[in-house]
């Protein structure tokens, strides 16, 4: 997970600390060897970052992410280096957080979106009115 944390810090200026998720034993035994789950902390927010040991398809990533949200009660961020633009757009439409190191981080639970694929990074912070519209 160092790649993700380095990306968030060096490119976007987000100082996030992380360690292995202490409740890892809640993950189904057949899935445990194939997934790395870190508990991350940023400001006062705590969330999970998940990464698969193989290149999983988007439906599998979303299914596993949803089960981790249910198990942990925390926002869970998908980390996948090979997400195509259309896949990232689909995740954004469904408000599923993700990190695509070197390209984009979408963290809606922090009311922020970050892109680093362009020379000047873009940070979008939602105001309460926009947030209410997104909830509909």
Regions found by a protein language model. Give the residues of each.
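Alpha-helical interaction elements
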Residues: 122-136
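DNA-contacting interfaces and partner/effector-binding or oligomerization modules
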Residues: 1-96
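Short, charged, surface-exposed secondary-structure boundary motifs
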Residues: 107-113
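Charged, structured surface patches that assemble and position nucleic-acid processing machinery
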Residues: 95-107
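N-terminal intrinsically disordered, cationic/polar leader segments
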Residues: 116-119
